[in-house]
């Protein structure tokens, strides 16, 4: 895959735009901003919806108790819940996309792990021209403990980053 | 003046876009990004070049010595230098703008004070739809002491913020 370049394409050249989506209203608003401002009917852009699932250790730890071993039923139920969540977020994002009659290819990428690292790595791997994301995504507790995902991406993603706040 | 709204305009509605410019290559690159990606020939947008001069206390302190009183000649020479700098940055930004044959009104605003506060206040006062800026603007020492201006604006500016890094 082409590596992300922090360089400019000429006007009218097709762009690869990654929008980081999650369960929040804000990320859907960021997607709307992107469709309103970064796409044009004259250019065939590609919009990549990126959802990052938390790593299993984090998603399980909130239920965890010392010495407790999860049964395979519990683990498969949690995996199903995680899949359902991905599907719900993607469907919601697709509904937002469908409202804009735009000349845009849609792709979907689901990552797994620490959101800020996965987003920056994916942007680079996909050769993205722009990353669009909400300001407060990926959960209050993670932000409080680890700092803001959007702060990190604004610094380290290898392309321009648009940070959108929910009104 | 209309207050900045963190809401979406319909596609084709005219936009007010603030680009924070300074002496850096990166801010000129941010301006190019803006002209390539956020303006369209079909829409009459307004691009506002915002330059923030440091407050006098900061610009003078690097020359200052305890007990030293500046003569009026020194002060007026420093004021002239500051005006020349504003003029040089604005001229450079206008040259970048002129390279893009775009349907964009150009306005210039010069602020004075702490860059991050002045940028956020100006965005709000001007009713801006988008703020575009470099990642590392407004000097190494100020960043090291006070944190990044772009970090602050990404969090507190009342509109979507685009952070552009120089390649």
What is each residue range found by the language model?
Chain A
Residues 1-13, 36, 80, 87, ...:
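Structural beta-alpha unit
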Residues 5-75, 95-105:
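Small/aliphatic-rich secondary-structure junction motif
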Residues 27-30, 123, 150, 157:
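Small-residue (primarily alanine) positions within well-ordered alpha-helices
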Residues 48-50, 107-111, 162:
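General small-molecule cofactor/ligand-binding pocket signal
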Residues 55, 113, 136-139:
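Short glycine-rich anion-binding loops that position phosphate/pyrophosphate groups of nucleotides
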Residues 70-88:
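A short acidic, glycine-rich active-site loop
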Residues 130-156:
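Glycine-rich, Arg-bearing micro-motifs that act as flexible, cationic patches
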Residues 158-167:
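C-terminal helix/juxtamembrane-tail motif
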């Amino acid at each position: 895959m082409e590596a992300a370049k922090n360089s400019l394409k000429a006007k009218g050249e097709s762009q690869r735009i990654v929008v980081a989506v999650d369960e929040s209203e804000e990320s859907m608003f960021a997607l709307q901003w992107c469709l309103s401002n970064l796409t044009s009917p004259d250019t065939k852009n590609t919009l990549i919806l990126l959802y990052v699932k938390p790593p299993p250790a984090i998603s399980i730890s909130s239920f965890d108790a010392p010495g407790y071993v999860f049964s395979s039923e519990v683990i498969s139920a949690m995996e199903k819940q995680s899949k359902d969540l991905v599907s719900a977020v993607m469907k919601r994002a697709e509904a937002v996309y469908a409202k804009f009659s735009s000349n845009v290819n849609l792709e979907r990428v689901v990552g797994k792990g620490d959101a800020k690292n996965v987003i920056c790595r994916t942007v680079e791997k996909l050769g993205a021209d722009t990353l669009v994301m909400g300001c407060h995504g990926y959960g209050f507790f993670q932000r409080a403990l680890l700092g803001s995902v959007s702060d990190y991406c604004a610094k380290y993603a290898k392309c321009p980053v648009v940070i959108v706040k929910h009104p």
